[in-house]
UniProtKB/Swiss-Prot annotation:
Cofactor(s) the protein requires to work: FMN
UniProt keyword annotation of Oxidoreductase present: yes
Summary of subunit composition and partner proteins: Homodimer.
Protein name: FMN-dependent NADH:quinone oxidoreductase 1
UniProt xrefs under InterPro entries: Flavodoxin_fold, Flavoprotein-like_sf, FMN-dep_NADH:Q_OxRdtase_AzoR1, NADH:quinone_OxRdtase_FMN_depd
Lineage: superkingdom: Bacteria
Signal peptide coordinates: none
């Protein structure tokens, strides 16, 4: 039996607002997860407006022990700390990812760089990196205009699975609305069926 969902972190990254299909599908998925888990809290994070890129100061601060950081270093990591706290507090992530030129939006990549922190969301071992954000579920809603998901040109799916696993989130379900420009009506209907199936499993 699935564990009840208590807090959902919904992450949007599309540059589009009202017309964004990834936003609409992610919202539908979130609403159905809430319906299956009454009382679940939702925290929304829209990264489309852009986040700071990682800088030399950020890197230096992140590798400095917390009790040895200067005030400037603490300020350099303040946003990263806040974003990581949101992820740590959630048991479920819903990530809306439109494909831009075969990959994820630059704003989403900037967000991911902010939350991938050594000794915070992953640690190095002799056997390789180990993720520290365990016991979480992620749903990745991907939308492409004309590129088939899991094709050689799809650099979204493998990347999202890899980076989520890197920080410890290995239970990942993809909701795919690929080639939406080819047949929008049928592709949307199929994505909604995927959402229904995923939320049915979550409620089981």
């Amino acid at each position: 039996m699935s564990q009840p969902i208590t807090r959902i972190l919904k992450i949007d990254s599309s540059a589009r607002a009202e017309s964004s299909m990834s936003r609409k599908l992610a919202q539908q998925l979130t609403e159905q997860l809430i319906a299956a888990n009454p009382g679940a809290e939702v925290v929304s994070r829209d990264v489309s407006g852009g986040l700071p890129f990682v800088t030399e100061e950020w890197i230096g601060a992140s590798y400095t022990p917390a009790d040895q950081r200067t005030e400037a270093q603490n300020q350099a990591l303040a946003l990263s700390d806040s974003l990581i706290e949101e992820v740590q507090a959630a048991d479920t992530l819903v990530i809306a990812v439109p494909m831009y030129n075969f990959s994820v939006p630059a704003t989403l990549k900037a967000y991911i760089d902010q939350i991938c922190r050594a000794q915070v969301t992953f640690r190095y071992t002799e056997q390789g990196p180990v993720g520290l954000l365990e016991n979480k579920k992620a749903y990745v809603v991907t939308v492409t205009g004309g590129t088939p998901v899991n094709s050689a040109a799809d650099f979204v799916s493998a990347y999202m699975r890899q980076v989520l696993g890197f920080i410890g989130i290995k239970d990942v379900t993809f909701i795919n609305a690929d080639r939406i420009m080819v047949d929008p009506e049928s592709i949307l209907a199929d994505a909604q069926q995927q959402i229904a199936a995923a939320t049915e499993v979550a409620a089981a």
